[in-house]
Swiss-Prot record:
Stored InterPro entries: FAM98
Composition bias type Polar residues, residue spans: 505-518
Organism field: Pongo abelii (Sumatran orangutan)
UniProt-recorded name of the protein: Protein FAM98A
GO CC annotations on file: tRNA-splicing ligase complex
Length: 518
Protein backbone atom coordinates (compact mmCIF):
# COMPACT_ATOMS: atom_id res chain seq x y z
CA UNK A 1 0.00 0.00 0.00
CA UNK A 2 2.81 2.38 0.89
CA UNK A 3 4.68 1.59 -2.33
CA UNK A 4 1.55 2.24 -4.39
CA UNK A 5 1.18 5.69 -2.85
CA UNK A 6 4.83 6.47 -3.52
CA UNK A 7 4.49 5.38 -7.15
CA UNK A 8 1.46 7.64 -7.61
CA UNK A 9 3.30 10.65 -6.18
CA UNK A 10 6.36 9.94 -8.33
CA UNK A 11 4.32 9.76 -11.54
CA UNK A 12 2.58 13.06 -10.79
CA UNK A 13 5.89 14.77 -9.99
CA UNK A 14 7.53 13.43 -13.16
CA UNK A 15 4.74 14.90 -15.25
CA UNK A 16 5.19 18.26 -13.52
CA UNK A 17 8.94 18.18 -14.17
CA UNK A 18 8.41 17.54 -17.88
CA UNK A 19 9.48 13.90 -18.09
CA UNK A 20 8.31 12.27 -21.34
CA UNK A 21 9.78 8.78 -20.98
CA UNK A 22 8.10 5.38 -21.23
CA UNK A 23 7.73 4.96 -17.46
CA UNK A 24 4.65 7.18 -17.45
CA UNK A 25 2.62 4.33 -18.93
CA UNK A 26 0.48 2.20 -16.65
CA UNK A 27 2.47 -0.39 -14.73
CA UNK A 28 5.80 0.56 -16.33
CA UNK A 29 7.17 2.33 -13.26
CA UNK A 30 6.13 -0.49 -10.93
CA UNK A 31 7.89 -3.04 -13.13
CA UNK A 32 11.04 -0.92 -13.38
CA UNK A 33 11.43 -0.32 -9.64
CA UNK A 34 10.81 -3.99 -8.94
CA UNK A 35 13.91 -4.83 -10.97
CA UNK A 36 15.80 -1.89 -9.50
CA UNK A 37 19.32 -1.24 -10.77
CA UNK A 38 18.99 -4.21 -13.12
CA UNK A 39 16.32 -2.35 -15.12
CA UNK A 40 17.76 -0.09 -17.88
CA UNK A 41 14.59 2.00 -17.85
CA UNK A 42 15.01 2.70 -14.13
CA UNK A 43 18.63 3.76 -14.64
CA UNK A 44 17.62 6.01 -17.56
CA UNK A 45 15.09 7.79 -15.34
CA UNK A 46 17.70 8.32 -12.62
CA UNK A 47 20.21 9.59 -15.19
CA UNK A 48 17.64 12.07 -16.54
CA UNK A 49 16.93 13.47 -13.06
CA UNK A 50 20.65 13.83 -12.31
CA UNK A 51 21.30 15.58 -15.63
CA UNK A 52 18.57 18.10 -14.84
CA UNK A 53 20.09 18.67 -11.40
CA UNK A 54 23.55 19.27 -12.84
CA UNK A 55 22.19 22.13 -14.92
CA UNK A 56 21.12 23.99 -11.79
CA UNK A 57 23.60 22.71 -9.19
CA UNK A 58 27.35 22.39 -9.20
CA UNK A 59 27.69 18.61 -8.95
CA UNK A 60 30.90 16.77 -9.67
CA UNK A 61 29.43 13.28 -9.62
CA UNK A 62 27.37 12.00 -12.51
CA UNK A 63 25.21 8.96 -13.20
CA UNK A 64 25.13 7.14 -16.54
CA UNK A 65 22.25 4.97 -17.69
CA UNK A 66 22.86 1.25 -18.22
CA UNK A 67 22.11 -0.89 -21.26
CA UNK A 68 22.01 -4.29 -19.59
CA UNK A 69 21.54 -5.79 -16.09
CA UNK A 70 25.25 -6.63 -15.94
CA UNK A 71 26.08 -2.94 -15.45
CA UNK A 72 23.96 -2.68 -12.30
CA UNK A 73 26.91 -2.68 -9.89
CA UNK A 74 28.67 0.15 -11.70
CA UNK A 75 25.45 2.15 -11.70
CA UNK A 76 25.01 1.66 -7.96
CA UNK A 77 28.56 2.84 -7.30
CA UNK A 78 27.89 6.01 -9.28
CA UNK A 79 24.64 6.61 -7.37
CA UNK A 80 26.44 6.08 -4.05
CA UNK A 81 29.02 8.74 -4.91
CA UNK A 82 26.30 11.16 -6.01
CA UNK A 83 24.28 10.68 -2.82
CA UNK A 84 27.41 11.21 -0.74
CA UNK A 85 28.09 14.52 -2.49
CA UNK A 86 24.48 15.64 -2.01
CA UNK A 87 24.47 14.62 1.69
CA UNK A 88 21.48 12.32 1.30
CA UNK A 89 19.73 11.91 4.69
CA UNK A 90 18.30 8.43 4.01
CA UNK A 91 20.42 5.76 5.69
CA UNK A 92 18.94 2.97 3.61
CA UNK A 93 20.46 4.61 0.51
CA UNK A 94 23.85 5.48 2.02
CA UNK A 95 24.64 2.51 4.27
CA UNK A 96 24.91 -1.22 3.78
CA UNK A 97 26.19 -3.20 0.81
CA UNK A 98 26.56 -0.85 -2.15
CA UNK A 99 25.76 -3.55 -4.71
CA UNK A 100 22.47 -4.51 -3.04
CA UNK A 101 20.93 -1.18 -2.02
CA UNK A 102 19.02 -0.57 -5.24
CA UNK A 103 17.79 -4.12 -5.65
CA UNK A 104 14.98 -3.44 -3.16
CA UNK A 105 11.78 -1.91 -4.51
CA UNK A 106 11.25 0.45 -1.56
CA UNK A 107 14.80 1.81 -1.80
CA UNK A 108 14.37 2.46 -5.53
CA UNK A 109 11.17 4.41 -4.89
CA UNK A 110 12.92 6.33 -2.11
CA UNK A 111 15.79 7.24 -4.45
CA UNK A 112 13.40 8.57 -7.09
CA UNK A 113 11.50 10.56 -4.45
CA UNK A 114 14.73 12.13 -3.18
CA UNK A 115 16.03 13.08 -6.64
CA UNK A 116 12.65 14.51 -7.65
CA UNK A 117 12.39 16.64 -4.50
CA UNK A 118 15.93 17.98 -4.98
CA UNK A 119 15.20 18.88 -8.60
CA UNK A 120 11.97 20.64 -7.67
CA UNK A 121 13.72 22.65 -4.96
CA UNK A 122 16.57 23.61 -7.30
CA UNK A 123 14.15 24.86 -9.94
CA UNK A 124 12.21 26.93 -7.41
CA UNK A 125 15.41 28.53 -6.14
CA UNK A 126 16.45 29.33 -9.68
CA UNK A 127 13.14 31.05 -10.38
CA UNK A 128 13.03 33.00 -7.12
CA UNK A 129 16.69 34.10 -7.29
CA UNK A 130 17.59 34.86 -10.91
CA UNK A 131 21.27 35.42 -11.70
CA UNK A 132 22.50 38.94 -11.08
CA UNK A 133 22.73 41.12 -14.11
CA UNK A 134 25.98 42.77 -15.00
CA UNK A 135 26.26 46.28 -13.71
CA UNK A 136 25.60 49.13 -16.05
CA UNK A 137 28.72 50.02 -17.91
CA UNK A 138 29.72 46.38 -18.23
CA UNK A 139 32.24 44.31 -16.32
CA UNK A 140 32.73 43.56 -12.67
CA UNK A 141 33.52 45.99 -9.87
CA UNK A 142 37.26 45.32 -10.13
CA UNK A 143 37.18 45.94 -13.85
CA UNK A 144 35.38 49.22 -13.34
CA UNK A 145 38.00 50.34 -10.80
CA UNK A 146 40.84 49.53 -13.17
CA UNK A 147 39.02 51.27 -15.97
CA UNK A 148 38.68 54.38 -13.80
CA UNK A 149 42.43 54.35 -13.10
CA UNK A 150 43.25 54.17 -16.77
CA UNK A 151 40.88 57.03 -17.57
CA UNK A 152 42.29 59.20 -14.74
CA UNK A 153 45.85 58.64 -15.93
CA UNK A 154 44.94 59.19 -19.55
CA UNK A 155 45.92 55.69 -20.64
CA UNK A 156 44.59 54.09 -23.78
CA UNK A 157 42.51 50.93 -23.73
CA UNK A 158 44.78 47.93 -23.09
CA UNK A 159 44.80 45.10 -25.65
CA UNK A 160 42.76 41.98 -24.98
CA UNK A 161 45.77 39.62 -24.76
CA UNK A 162 47.65 41.65 -22.11
CA UNK A 163 48.64 39.92 -18.86
CA UNK A 164 47.96 41.31 -15.42
CA UNK A 165 51.67 41.85 -14.78
CA UNK A 166 52.01 43.86 -17.97
CA UNK A 167 48.87 45.82 -17.16
CA UNK A 168 49.99 46.88 -13.67
CA UNK A 169 53.50 47.59 -14.89
CA UNK A 170 52.00 50.01 -17.39
CA UNK A 171 49.98 51.72 -14.63
CA UNK A 172 53.10 52.11 -12.45
CA UNK A 173 55.07 53.61 -15.32
CA UNK A 174 52.28 56.07 -16.08
CA UNK A 175 52.05 57.10 -12.39
CA UNK A 176 55.75 57.92 -12.22
CA UNK A 177 55.50 60.01 -15.35
CA UNK A 178 52.55 61.94 -13.91
CA UNK A 179 54.20 62.57 -10.52
CA UNK A 180 57.29 63.93 -12.21
CA UNK A 181 55.20 66.75 -13.64
CA UNK A 182 53.99 68.06 -10.25
CA UNK A 183 55.84 69.64 -7.28
CA UNK A 184 57.58 67.24 -4.87
CA UNK A 185 55.17 67.83 -1.99
CA UNK A 186 52.07 67.89 -4.13
CA UNK A 187 50.86 64.46 -3.05
CA UNK A 188 52.57 64.25 0.32
CA UNK A 189 53.93 61.31 2.21
CA UNK A 190 51.68 58.37 2.99
CA UNK A 191 50.27 58.11 6.48
CA UNK A 192 50.67 54.32 6.58
CA UNK A 193 54.27 53.36 5.92
CA UNK A 194 54.65 49.92 7.48
CA UNK A 195 54.32 46.92 5.21
CA UNK A 196 51.25 44.77 5.83
CA UNK A 197 50.75 41.03 5.41
CA UNK A 198 47.53 39.11 4.70
CA UNK A 199 46.76 38.72 8.42
CA UNK A 200 47.12 42.46 8.97
CA UNK A 201 44.83 43.28 6.08
CA UNK A 202 42.17 40.94 7.45
CA UNK A 203 42.29 42.68 10.83
CA UNK A 204 42.16 46.11 9.18
CA UNK A 205 39.16 45.00 7.14
CA UNK A 206 37.39 43.76 10.29
CA UNK A 207 38.07 47.04 12.10
CA UNK A 208 36.77 49.01 9.14
CA UNK A 209 33.61 46.90 9.01
CA UNK A 210 32.92 47.44 12.73
CA UNK A 211 33.35 51.20 12.36
CA UNK A 212 31.18 51.20 9.23
CA UNK A 213 28.38 49.42 11.10
CA UNK A 214 28.55 51.95 13.92
CA UNK A 215 28.43 54.93 11.60
CA UNK A 216 25.63 53.37 9.58
CA UNK A 217 23.45 53.45 12.69
CA UNK A 218 24.37 57.08 13.28
CA UNK A 219 23.62 57.99 9.68
CA UNK A 220 20.21 56.33 9.86
CA UNK A 221 19.43 58.30 13.02
CA UNK A 222 20.40 61.62 11.47
CA UNK A 223 18.48 60.89 8.27
CA UNK A 224 15.39 59.95 10.24
CA UNK A 225 15.61 63.16 12.27
CA UNK A 226 15.94 65.09 9.04
CA UNK A 227 12.85 63.42 7.57
CA UNK A 228 10.79 64.10 10.68
CA UNK A 229 11.90 67.72 10.86
CA UNK A 230 11.08 68.39 7.23
CA UNK A 231 7.76 66.62 7.65
CA UNK A 232 6.89 68.87 10.59
CA UNK A 233 7.36 71.91 8.39
CA UNK A 234 4.30 70.89 6.43
CA UNK A 235 1.93 70.68 9.39
CA UNK A 236 0.95 74.33 9.33
CA UNK A 237 -2.00 75.43 7.24
CA UNK A 238 0.19 77.78 5.27
CA UNK A 239 2.68 75.07 4.37
CA UNK A 240 0.06 72.52 3.33
CA UNK A 241 -0.46 74.41 0.10
CA UNK A 242 3.28 74.24 -0.59
CA UNK A 243 3.65 70.49 -0.16
CA UNK A 244 4.49 69.80 -3.78
CA UNK A 245 7.12 72.53 -3.91
CA UNK A 246 8.69 71.27 -0.71
CA UNK A 247 8.86 67.72 -2.03
CA UNK A 248 10.30 68.88 -5.34
CA UNK A 249 13.14 70.66 -3.57
CA UNK A 250 13.74 68.16 -0.77
CA UNK A 251 13.51 64.76 -2.45
CA UNK A 252 16.47 65.19 -4.86
CA UNK A 253 18.74 66.19 -2.00
CA UNK A 254 17.35 63.46 0.24
CA UNK A 255 17.95 60.70 -2.30
CA UNK A 256 21.67 61.48 -2.32
CA UNK A 257 21.99 60.74 1.39
CA UNK A 258 22.83 57.10 1.95
CA UNK A 259 23.14 55.33 5.30
CA UNK A 260 25.93 53.14 3.95
CA UNK A 261 29.47 54.29 4.48
CA UNK A 262 31.71 54.66 1.45
CA UNK A 263 34.98 54.48 3.37
CA UNK A 264 37.12 51.44 2.56
CA UNK A 265 40.65 50.19 3.16
CA UNK A 266 41.68 51.98 -0.02
CA UNK A 267 41.09 55.29 1.72
CA UNK A 268 43.58 54.22 4.38
CA UNK A 269 46.22 53.59 1.76
CA UNK A 270 45.47 56.91 0.11
CA UNK A 271 45.63 58.87 3.37
CA UNK A 272 48.47 61.35 3.65
CA UNK A 273 50.20 62.93 6.59
CA UNK A 274 48.19 66.10 6.31
CA UNK A 275 45.23 64.19 7.77
CA UNK A 276 47.14 63.66 11.02
CA UNK A 277 47.33 67.38 11.77
CA UNK A 278 44.92 68.42 14.49
CA UNK A 279 43.87 72.06 14.30
CA UNK A 280 42.18 73.79 17.19
CA UNK A 281 39.13 75.57 15.86
CA UNK A 282 39.06 77.82 18.93
CA UNK A 283 42.55 79.18 18.47
CA UNK A 284 42.98 82.83 17.63
CA UNK A 285 44.77 82.36 14.34
CA UNK A 286 42.21 79.88 13.06
CA UNK A 287 39.33 81.96 14.39
CA UNK A 288 40.46 85.02 12.49
CA UNK A 289 40.44 83.14 9.22
CA UNK A 290 37.12 81.43 9.83
CA UNK A 291 35.23 84.35 11.35
CA UNK A 292 31.85 85.16 9.88
CA UNK A 293 28.69 87.05 10.75
CA UNK A 294 27.05 84.10 12.44
CA UNK A 295 29.70 84.10 15.15
CA UNK A 296 28.47 87.48 16.35
CA UNK A 297 24.91 86.34 16.94
CA UNK A 298 24.22 85.65 20.60
CA UNK A 299 21.54 83.23 21.57
CA UNK A 300 18.95 84.47 24.03
CA UNK A 301 17.82 82.75 27.18
CA UNK A 302 15.72 79.70 26.55
CA UNK A 303 13.51 77.90 29.06
CA UNK A 304 14.92 74.89 30.76
CA UNK A 305 13.24 71.84 29.32
CA UNK A 306 14.66 69.47 31.90
CA UNK A 307 15.41 65.91 30.92
CA UNK A 308 18.21 65.33 33.41
CA UNK A 309 18.10 61.79 34.73
CA UNK A 310 18.70 62.79 38.34
CA UNK A 311 15.62 65.03 38.26
CA UNK A 312 13.19 62.55 36.75
CA UNK A 313 10.74 61.01 39.18
CA UNK A 314 10.64 57.23 39.21
CA UNK A 315 7.70 55.68 37.39
CA UNK A 316 4.80 54.36 39.45
CA UNK A 317 5.04 50.71 40.40
CA UNK A 318 3.36 48.27 38.10
CA UNK A 319 1.71 46.48 41.02
CA UNK A 320 0.19 48.11 44.11
CA UNK A 321 2.09 47.53 47.32
CA UNK A 322 1.05 44.53 49.31
CA UNK A 323 -0.97 45.29 52.40
CA UNK A 324 -1.99 43.11 55.23
CA UNK A 325 -5.55 41.98 54.91
CA UNK A 326 -7.81 43.73 57.39
CA UNK A 327 -9.90 41.53 59.60
CA UNK A 328 -13.63 41.94 59.27
CA UNK A 329 -15.90 42.84 62.18
CA UNK A 330 -16.18 40.18 64.80
CA UNK A 331 -19.52 38.43 64.68
CA UNK A 332 -21.48 37.56 67.74
CA UNK A 333 -21.21 33.85 67.69
CA UNK A 334 -22.83 33.13 71.01
CA UNK A 335 -24.32 36.18 72.49
CA UNK A 336 -27.62 35.68 74.03
CA UNK A 337 -27.94 32.06 73.22
CA UNK A 338 -31.21 32.12 75.00
CA UNK A 339 -32.34 28.56 74.81
CA UNK A 340 -34.15 26.25 77.00
CA UNK A 341 -31.41 23.74 76.80
CA UNK A 342 -30.27 24.01 80.34
CA UNK A 343 -31.66 22.99 83.62
CA UNK A 344 -35.27 24.06 83.25
CA UNK A 345 -37.47 24.58 86.22
CA UNK A 346 -40.66 25.11 84.37
CA UNK A 347 -42.52 23.35 81.71
CA UNK A 348 -41.96 25.81 78.96
CA UNK A 349 -41.36 23.09 76.50
CA UNK A 350 -38.20 22.46 74.69
CA UNK A 351 -36.77 19.35 76.15
CA UNK A 352 -33.18 20.18 75.50
CA UNK A 353 -30.85 19.11 78.19
CA UNK A 354 -31.92 17.65 81.43
CA UNK A 355 -35.44 18.72 82.25
CA UNK A 356 -36.36 18.31 85.79
CA UNK A 357 -39.62 20.01 86.03
CA UNK A 358 -40.85 19.77 82.54
CA UNK A 359 -42.52 16.44 82.80
CA UNK A 360 -45.18 17.16 80.33
CA UNK A 361 -43.13 19.90 78.91
CA UNK A 362 -45.42 20.72 76.13
CA UNK A 363 -45.09 20.43 72.45
CA UNK A 364 -42.56 23.03 71.70
CA UNK A 365 -42.07 26.40 73.14
CA UNK A 366 -45.64 27.60 73.07
CA UNK A 367 -47.47 24.50 74.03
CA UNK A 368 -47.52 23.95 77.73
CA UNK A 369 -49.60 20.93 78.03
CA UNK A 370 -48.88 18.60 75.20
CA UNK A 371 -46.98 15.49 75.65
CA UNK A 372 -44.55 16.59 73.05
CA UNK A 373 -42.88 13.28 72.94
CA UNK A 374 -40.68 12.15 75.65
CA UNK A 375 -40.65 11.44 79.25
CA UNK A 376 -39.85 14.64 80.87
CA UNK A 377 -38.18 13.33 83.94
CA UNK A 378 -35.88 10.75 82.55
CA UNK A 379 -32.37 11.57 83.67
CA UNK A 380 -29.22 10.55 81.85
CA UNK A 381 -31.12 8.62 79.35
CA UNK A 382 -32.80 10.93 77.10
CA UNK A 383 -34.52 8.16 75.26
CA UNK A 384 -37.75 9.30 73.81
CA UNK A 385 -40.47 6.88 73.31
CA UNK A 386 -42.64 9.62 71.98
CA UNK A 387 -41.32 9.29 68.50
CA UNK A 388 -40.73 12.65 67.12
CA UNK A 389 -42.21 14.47 69.94
CA UNK A 390 -45.56 12.86 69.69
CA UNK A 391 -46.44 14.84 66.67
CA UNK A 392 -44.24 13.05 64.17
CA UNK A 393 -42.81 14.60 61.04
CA UNK A 394 -43.21 18.27 61.47
CA UNK A 395 -44.42 17.93 64.95
CA UNK A 396 -44.37 20.82 67.27
CA UNK A 397 -41.72 19.20 69.32
CA UNK A 398 -39.37 18.75 66.40
CA UNK A 399 -39.95 21.34 63.79
CA UNK A 400 -41.92 23.19 66.32
CA UNK A 401 -42.57 26.61 65.01
CA UNK A 402 -38.95 27.10 65.47
CA UNK A 403 -38.75 30.44 63.87
CA UNK A 404 -38.62 32.16 67.21
CA UNK A 405 -39.69 29.53 69.60
CA UNK A 406 -37.57 28.55 72.47
CA UNK A 407 -35.69 25.75 70.98
CA UNK A 408 -35.77 26.82 67.38
CA UNK A 409 -33.92 29.90 66.39
CA UNK A 410 -30.32 29.61 67.38
CA UNK A 411 -28.07 32.22 68.70
CA UNK A 412 -30.18 35.22 69.43
CA UNK A 413 -33.53 33.83 70.45
CA UNK A 414 -33.37 30.14 70.29
CA UNK A 415 -32.94 27.63 72.91
CA UNK A 416 -30.57 24.82 72.75
CA UNK A 417 -29.74 23.51 69.34
CA UNK A 418 -31.89 20.62 68.41
CA UNK A 419 -33.55 20.75 71.67
CA UNK A 420 -37.02 21.61 72.52
CA UNK A 421 -38.00 18.07 71.95
CA UNK A 422 -36.07 18.22 68.74
CA UNK A 423 -37.73 15.37 66.99
CA UNK A 424 -38.93 13.48 69.77
CA UNK A 425 -35.74 13.83 71.54
CA UNK A 426 -36.28 14.33 75.17
CA UNK A 427 -32.69 15.15 75.65
CA UNK A 428 -31.92 14.43 79.18
CA UNK A 429 -28.32 15.25 79.27
CA UNK A 430 -27.30 16.66 75.96
CA UNK A 431 -23.68 17.51 76.08
CA UNK A 432 -24.30 20.57 74.06
CA UNK A 433 -27.86 21.61 74.29
CA UNK A 434 -27.75 24.12 71.65
CA UNK A 435 -26.11 24.92 68.46
CA UNK A 436 -22.45 25.41 68.02
CA UNK A 437 -22.59 28.86 69.46
CA UNK A 438 -25.61 29.00 71.65
CA UNK A 439 -25.56 28.94 75.33
CA UNK A 440 -26.32 25.87 77.23
CA UNK A 441 -25.80 27.03 80.75
CA UNK A 442 -27.85 27.13 83.84
CA UNK A 443 -31.10 28.70 82.85
CA UNK A 444 -33.36 30.07 85.52
CA UNK A 445 -36.08 31.94 83.68
CA UNK A 446 -36.49 29.73 80.69
CA UNK A 447 -35.75 32.62 78.36
CA UNK A 448 -32.17 33.56 78.68
CA UNK A 449 -29.27 31.26 78.82
CA UNK A 450 -26.07 32.64 80.01
CA UNK A 451 -23.50 30.30 78.69
CA UNK A 452 -22.32 29.71 82.19
CA UNK A 453 -22.23 26.61 84.28
CA UNK A 454 -24.82 24.07 83.32
CA UNK A 455 -26.62 22.76 86.23
CA UNK A 456 -26.75 19.17 85.35
CA UNK A 457 -24.09 17.63 83.16
CA UNK A 458 -25.21 19.48 80.10
CA UNK A 459 -23.91 22.61 78.95
CA UNK A 460 -21.49 22.69 76.11
CA UNK A 461 -20.19 26.06 75.21
CA UNK A 462 -22.31 29.04 75.85
CA UNK A 463 -21.81 31.38 73.01
CA UNK A 464 -18.19 30.42 72.58
CA UNK A 465 -18.05 31.43 76.13
CA UNK A 466 -18.19 29.62 79.38
CA UNK A 467 -17.41 26.05 79.66
CA UNK A 468 -20.58 24.12 80.15
CA UNK A 469 -20.39 21.52 82.77
CA UNK A 470 -19.08 18.07 82.25
CA UNK A 471 -21.32 17.29 79.37
CA UNK A 472 -18.83 16.00 76.89
CA UNK A 473 -16.54 18.18 74.95
CA UNK A 474 -17.70 21.72 74.84
CA UNK A 475 -17.49 21.94 71.11
CA UNK A 476 -19.56 18.90 70.30
CA UNK A 477 -23.04 20.03 69.54
CA UNK A 478 -26.01 18.49 71.09
CA UNK A 479 -27.18 16.27 68.32
CA UNK A 480 -29.26 13.61 69.94
CA UNK A 481 -28.34 14.74 73.34
CA UNK A 482 -26.56 11.64 74.39
CA UNK A 483 -24.20 11.42 77.19
CA UNK A 484 -22.26 14.45 76.33
CA UNK A 485 -19.50 13.29 74.06
CA UNK A 486 -21.37 10.61 72.15
CA UNK A 487 -23.42 12.51 69.67
CA UNK A 488 -23.71 12.66 65.98
CA UNK A 489 -22.85 16.28 65.40
CA UNK A 490 -19.15 16.60 65.82
CA UNK A 491 -18.47 20.28 66.24
CA UNK A 492 -22.08 21.35 65.74
CA UNK A 493 -22.03 21.36 61.97
CA UNK A 494 -25.76 21.47 61.55
CA UNK A 495 -26.20 23.83 64.44
CA UNK A 496 -23.79 26.30 62.87
CA UNK A 497 -25.34 25.94 59.47
CA UNK A 498 -28.91 26.49 60.57
CA UNK A 499 -28.39 28.67 63.58
CA UNK A 500 -29.69 31.70 61.71
CA UNK A 501 -32.08 29.89 59.50
CA UNK A 502 -35.14 29.94 61.62
CA UNK A 503 -35.65 26.19 61.76
CA UNK A 504 -33.94 23.49 63.64
CA UNK A 505 -33.48 20.09 62.14
CA UNK A 506 -32.59 16.86 63.68
CA UNK A 507 -29.54 15.10 62.28
CA UNK A 508 -31.51 12.11 61.27
CA UNK A 509 -34.20 13.96 59.36
CA UNK A 510 -37.72 14.85 60.34
CA UNK A 511 -38.59 12.80 63.29
CA UNK A 512 -37.71 9.20 63.16
CA UNK A 513 -39.19 6.81 65.60
CA UNK A 514 -37.46 6.39 68.81
CA UNK A 515 -34.15 7.94 69.51
CA UNK A 516 -31.97 6.40 72.10
CA UNK A 517 -28.95 8.01 73.54
CA UNK A 518 -26.96 6.34 76.16
Amino acid sequence: MECDLMETDILESLEDLGYKGPLLEDGALSQAVSAGASSPEFTKLCAWLVSELRVLCKLEENVQATNSPSEAEEFQLEVSGLLGEMNCPYLSLTSGDVTKRLLIQKNCLLLLTYLISELEAARMLCVNAPPKKAQEGGGSEVFQELEGICIALGMSKPPANITMFQFFSGIEKKLKETLAKVPPNHVGKPLLKKPMGPAHWEKIEAINQAIANEYEVRRKLLIKRLDVTVQSFGWSDRAKSQTEKLAKVYQPKRSVLSPKSTISVAHLLAARQDLSKILRTSSGSIGEKTACAINKVLMGRVPDRGGRPNEIEPPPPEMPPWQKRQDGPQQQTGGRGGGRGGYEHSSYGGRGGHEQGGGRGGRGGYDHGGRGGGRGNKHQGGWTDGGSGGGGGYQDGGYRDSGFQPGGYHGGHSSGGYQGGGYGGFQTSSSYTGSGYQGGGYQQDNRYQDGGHHGDRGGGRGGRGGRGGRGGRAGQGGGWGGRGSQNYHQGGQFEQHFQHGGYQYNHSGFGQGRHYTS
